């Protein structure tokens, strides 16, 4: 039997427990004695039998009263608590003046990590993120030069144009980073390697990055209109350099400027002498301004850049301005200057471009003035004009003062064949001025680009190069034409 009623009632039941136990024992004894008495009546006197029966009846009456009292205790509500036995009081605690240390504040719960796909997995948690990045470019090329030109670097060639691997992300509070290693020309080197801080329209960059040298140079090679950039970008030694820069972007305006040293490879050169990194104290100032309004569905781009560099100790190593016959698989240079003692460079350029539906166009002019230790100041010139059209219903991307990625509107496997683009370009380079004869190049180029999926492209390029003052043939002729062709498969993520 379960008796309910709380702690106070339980205490009364426990208090009556010994009494009940005794009565039950006596009744049990009486029950056991009853047959004995019946059997032993012949031996007991009538008075003894009557006394025994009277005692049993008295015990039964007492048991009945105890059951009634027990029922009353367990069924009636408690109004007063029974007096509890005096509790033993513990000794009073000794007073102390040491305050209890407050618990450390709870750490805020971290934001869940989200995974999205942008060519490779991108992990994002709040304002922090990380994404692995890289690219693979495989080239084949053919340079058909006149028979009188003896150069084993011409003809057919194949190469792994670029292999890059790195990562980029955000640390929070506006701080970002990028790190890329590139394998090209049988050497591993750092390319984009920097830390950024963004606040409002401002972006500050510290590390190895491009000093804003022309639209074509700033446009990534995985989103370019041709396999190779304009001739002047290579001839004038455009490259990433170690420095600090700031960019302001608001509305149609992009303003960029920075202070740069030399490229990382030159600064880390372990050679002794003027080519050694420990003696390289060259530096320069670079700036660029872009006005890019949008008129209806047409994106316009107007830009200008100016650059100044003092070579200091690097002057003693000498500088050359030269260019390949378009395809990179050949290391031959058919036009180029001799090694010049350049102590200072001043170069500046103008940019114009548009994107309107399937059409895009771009044009640049660029001047490179080289101050020589001899006192002369030759100025070299380069430029190009290009026009492109998508045979599919796609458009060329543009963002932040430069061309950006095209995403096929109907990719392969998604109801289409991807994006198909046809581009043509006229490219000019003049390396002759003030007694310096480096040669001239007029190039007519055509490119067909198939992009079946985002991040995957296939190129076919053809070029007719018209040279003046180039590497002489056996008969001494320095004016001739060269046919070039190239193909590329590229994957970036």
Curated annotation (Swiss-Prot):
**Where is the segment annotated Disordered?**
96-124
Superkingdom of the source species = Bacteria
Gene3D superfamilies per record:
Porin
The record ties this protein, via Pfam families, to:
Porin_O_P
InterPro entries on file: Porin_dom_sf (IPR023614), Porin_O/P (IPR010870)
What is the name attached to this protein's record?
Uncharacterized protein CC_0911
Q: Which organism is it from?
A: Caulobacter vibrioides (strain ATCC 19089 / CIP 103742 / CB 15) (Caulobacter crescentus)
């Amino acid at each position: 039997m379960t008796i309910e009623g709380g702690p106070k009632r339980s205490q009364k039941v426990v208090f009556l427990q010994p009494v009940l136990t005794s009565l039950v024992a006596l009744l049990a004894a009486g029950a056991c004695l009853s047959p004995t008495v019946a059997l032993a009546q012949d031996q007991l006197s009538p008075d003894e039998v009557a006394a025994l029966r009277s005692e049993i009846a008295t015990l039964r009456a007492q048991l009945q009263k105890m059951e009634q009292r027990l029922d009353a205790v367990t069924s009636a509500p408690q109004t007063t608590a029974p007096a509890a036995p005096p509790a033993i009081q513990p000794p009073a605690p000794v007073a102390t003046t040491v305050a209890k240390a407050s618990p450390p504040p709870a750490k805020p719960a971290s934001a869940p990590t989200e995974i999205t796909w942008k060519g490779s997995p991108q992990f994002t948690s709040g304002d922090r993120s990380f994404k692995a990045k890289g690219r693979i470019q495989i080239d084949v090329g053919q340079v058909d030069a006149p028979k009188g030109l003896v150069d084993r670097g011409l003809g057919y060639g194949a190469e792994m144009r670029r292999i890059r691997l790195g990562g980029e992300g955000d640390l929070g509070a506006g701080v970002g980073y990028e790190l890329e290693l590139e394998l090209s020309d049988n050497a591993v080197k750092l390319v984009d390697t920097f830390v950024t801080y963004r606040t409002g329209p401002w972006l500050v960059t510290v590390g190895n990055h491009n000093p804003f040298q022309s639209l074509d140079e700033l446009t990534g090679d995985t989103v370019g209109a041709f396999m190779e950039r304009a001739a002047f970008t290579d001839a004038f030694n455009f490259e990433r350099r170690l420095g600090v820069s700031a960019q302001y972007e608001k509305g149609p305006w992009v303003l960029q400027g920075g202070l740069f040293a030399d490229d990382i490879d030159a600064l880390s050169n372990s050679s002794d002498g003027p080519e050694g990194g420990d003696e390289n104290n060259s530096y320069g100032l670079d700036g660029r301004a872009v006005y890019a309004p949008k008129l209806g569905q047409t994106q316009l781009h107007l830009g200008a850049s100016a650059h100044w560099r003092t070579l200091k100790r690097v002057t003693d190593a000498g500088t050359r301005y030269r260019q390949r016959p378009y395809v990179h698989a050949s290391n031959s240079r058919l036009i180029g200057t001799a090694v010049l003692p350049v102590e200072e460079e001043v170069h500046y350029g103008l940019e114009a471009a548009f994107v309107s539906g399937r059409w895009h166009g771009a044009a640049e002019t660029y001047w490179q003035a080289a101050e020589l230790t001899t006192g002369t100041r030759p100025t070299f010139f380069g430029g190009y004009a290009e026009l492109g059209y998508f045979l599919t219903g796609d458009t060329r991307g543009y963002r932040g003062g430069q061309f950006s990625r095209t995403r096929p509107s109907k990719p392969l496997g998604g109801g289409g064949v991807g994006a198909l683009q046809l581009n043509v370009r006229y490219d000019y380079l003049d390396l002759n001025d003030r007694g310096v004869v480096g040669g001239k190049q007029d190039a007519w180029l055509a490119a067909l680009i198939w992009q079946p999926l985002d991040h995957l492209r296939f190129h076919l390029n053809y070029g007719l190069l018209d040279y003046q003052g180039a590497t002489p043939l056996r008969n001494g002729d320095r004016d001739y034409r060269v046919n070039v062709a190239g193909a590329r498969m590229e994957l970036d993520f």
